[in-house]
Amino acid sequence: MVKKTRPAAVPRLFGTNGVRGIVNSREMDSQFALKLGMAIGTFMKGRVMLGTDARTSNEMLKSACAAGLMATGCDVLDCGVVPTPTLQYAVRTDDAAGGVMITASHNPPEFNGIKCIDSDGTEMSRASEETIERIYAEQAFSRASWDRVGRLVPHTNVIDRYVTDIVSRVDAEAIRKAGLRVALDCGNGAGSLVSPKVLERLGVKYVTLNSNPDGAFPAHNSEPTPENTRDVVELVRAGGFDMGIVHDGDADRTVFIDETGRYLFGDRSLAILAYHMCKAKPGSLVVTNVASSRCVEDAVRMAGGRIMLTRVGSPTIARVMKEYGGVFGGEENGGLIFADFQYCRDGAMAAAKMLETVAKNGKLSKLNDEIPSYCQFKTKTPCPDEKKDAVIRRLADEAKGLKVDTTDGVKILFDDCWVIVRPSGTEPIFRIFSEAKEESKAKELAERYKKRVESLVKA
């Protein structure tokens, strides 16, 4: 009798948002980019859009990845330095087989990454990533004959088309009439090439900070956290601006500062925009993840809309929106998805929509204050990957009799607060988020469950 053997486990390359690593380490050097490009080309089989953010290592990695793609017979359309959503727009509107973005998004400058885009412009599904990982691991590359090797073709008009399409999807006349003033911080990233053009086309007066592409990120790290947005907050407070707009490195995310200098976390922006979309079209479906603030659900229900909660991750939210007809979605990190434009996070589109909302409804601080507010607390604790499932099962068992949501990890809902314990998909840790009306209660709840997780890990 022949004994069947399981296929060998394939090492995981793709994390939540592509493959990332420190430049010129084994995880992210030119040899890796070449072979991964061959694996991607073997899978995609057609015209591939290729773009980069503003990082210093982009030309090296782009050249290697492009060589790999062409070796499999794919024609590569080089879009140059563009925001990730601009590349996604190019893939979708120019009938490409897929796209490859060289970016590490908000990571520090010594990092870079490679991200794959499906033919419909959405972030690649995990199933497709697993296929590419297997091709890479087995070196099962398609190799084109000498007369079928792909070509590298410049594709330089995508930014203008993208900007024009964004402007056409908001009430530009209302924005112009409002006479808005904006402080714009592009974080020295790819958004520097797009968002100023959007503001100009909308007739917005603006002042820029850090809006020249510079892969060293000299002003601040490209993650738009409260700590990294202090300069724009001070400018808004001092300069009489209607809002501040801040992008991450590849401009798929946007956070906003209101006219008083108050930083709005992404779920506040999500709640504000969701409220006004649902008010305009009652019954609209908004999609967010189970770790988002309750303020999003409150805002949607106040406006007569419907809400659906998913696992954490923008690809999941986008696909649920597409399947169930969601009009809008997003997450706490400032990644907002507008179904009437494209099913991916889009920082420039988010900026245009918020400008339209403020122009029609009043000051951003007022819109924010109209939405119920809660206090959140976030922490994390180490856990070996092999123990994560057992810890989650135990927590779910212990919560029997309570209101529990196991969409992503374990979320336990009480009358006036909640806590979620969810395993990271890329690190050996648990993330623990809590929310309550009082900051002290949110902190106590998160710390209590952190201690419980730590005891279960040790058991």
Question: Across the structure, where does each feature detected by a protein language model lie?
Answer:
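Gly/Ser/Thr-enriched, mixed-charge loops and adjacent short helices
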Residues: 2-9, 22, 112-239
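An N-terminal, well-structured beta->alpha segment
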Residues: 1-67, 71-73, 97, 151-182
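Short glycine-centered, acidic/aromatic-flanked micro-motifs in structured strand/loop junctions
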Residues: 51-53, 184-186, 258, 340, ...
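Active-site nucleophile and cofactor-binding loops and adjacent substrate-binding regions
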Residues: 76-85, 263-266, 288-289, 310-311
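N-terminal small/polar loop signature for handling phosphorylated ligands or for N-terminal nucleophile
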Residues: 42, 48-111, 197-257
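Phosphate-binding and adjacent anionic-ligand microenvironments
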Residues: 243, 279-459
